[in-house]
C-alpha cells in the first residue's frame, strides 16, 4: 500500500468508527430520554436521596448505593443498547468515549460519568435532594419577557414604521 492508500484506508476506518460511535450516542439519547429510564432512575433516587448530605465526608452507606446504581442503571442501558446493536460492548464504548468526550452532549456525558465517577454520582444525588426540598436553582428572577411586536395601544402615528 502506498501512502495515499494508507491515508484513505485510515480515513475510511476512522469515519466508520466515528459513525458507529455517533449511532451509539444517538441510541443513548433515546434511552435516557425514554419514560421507562426516567422512571427507573427517579425511583432509585427517591429511594436513597435522603441518605446524601452535602459534606466533605462520605458515609459508608454511599458505597453500596453506588454499586447498586451501577448494576441497575448501567445494566439497563447496556441491555437496551444490545437490543438496538447486537454485539454491543459497553467496555469498548467506555474506552472510545474517553477519546470523544468533547463531542458528546453534556447531559449524556454527565450521566455516563455517574457510572465511573463517585463524586459525579454524589453530586447527582445532592442536586436531586435540593430539588426535592425546594432548594434547586431558581433562574426565574433572571428572566425578562419582552414583546417583539409593537403594542397596538400606542397612538397610530407611533405604531407605524417609517423609513
Swiss-Prot record:
Belongs to the ARL2BP family. GO terms for cellular component: centrosome; ciliary basal body; cytosol; midbody; mitochondrial intermembrane space; nucleoplasm; spindle. One of its GO terms (molecular function) is transcription coactivator activity. Together with ARL2, plays a role in the nuclear translocation, retention and transcriptional activity of STAT3. May play a role as an effector of ARL2. The gene is ARL2BP. It comes from Pongo abelii (Sumatran orangutan). This is ADP-ribosylation factor-like protein 2-binding protein. InterPro entries: ARL2BP, BART_dom, BART_sf. Interacts with GTP bound ARL2 and ARL3; the complex ARL2-ARL2BP as well as ARL2BP alone, binds to SLC25A4/ANT1. Interaction with ARL2 may be required for cilia basal body localization. Interacts with STAT3; interaction is enhanced with ARL2. Found in a complex with ARL2BP, ARL2 and SLC25A6. Found in a complex with ARL2, ARL2BP and SLC25A4. Interacts with STAT2, STAT3 and STAT4. Keywords: Cell projection, Cilium, Cytoplasm, Cytoskeleton, Mitochondrion, Nucleus. GO terms for biological process: maintenance of protein location in nucleus; positive regulation of tyrosine phosphorylation of STAT protein. It is found in: Cytoplasm; Mitochondrion intermembrane space; Cytoplasm, Cytoskeleton, Microtubule organizing center, Centrosome; Nucleus.
Amino acid at each position: 500500500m502506498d501512502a495515499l492508500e494508507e491515508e484513505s484506508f485510515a480515513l475510511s476506518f476512522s469515519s466508520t468508527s466515528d459513525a458507529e460511535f455517533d449511532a451509539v450516542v444517538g441510541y443513548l439519547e433515546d434511552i435516557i430520554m425514554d419514560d421507562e429510564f426516567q422512571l427507573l432512575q427517579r425511583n432509585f433516587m427517591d429511594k436513597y436521596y435522603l441518605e446524601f448530605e452535602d459534606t466533605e465526608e462520605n458515609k459508608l452507606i454511599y458505597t453500596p448505593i453506588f454499586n447498586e446504581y451501577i448494576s441497575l442503571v448501567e445494566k439497563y442501558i447496556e441491555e437496551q443498547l444490545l437490543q438496538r446493536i447486537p454485539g454491543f460492548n459497553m467496555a469498548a464504548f467506555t474506552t472510545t468515549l474517553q477519546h470523544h468526550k468533547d463531542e458528546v452532549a453534556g447531559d449524556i456525558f454527565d450521566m455516563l460519568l455517574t457510572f465511573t465517577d463517585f463524586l459525579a454520582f454524589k453530586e447527582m444525588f445532592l442536586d436531586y435532594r435540593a430539588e426535592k426540598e425546594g432548594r434547586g436553582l431558581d433562574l426565574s428572577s433572571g428572566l425578562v419577557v419582552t414583546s417583539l411586536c409593537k403594542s397596538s395601544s400606542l397612538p397610530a402615528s407611533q405604531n407605524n414604521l417609517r423609513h
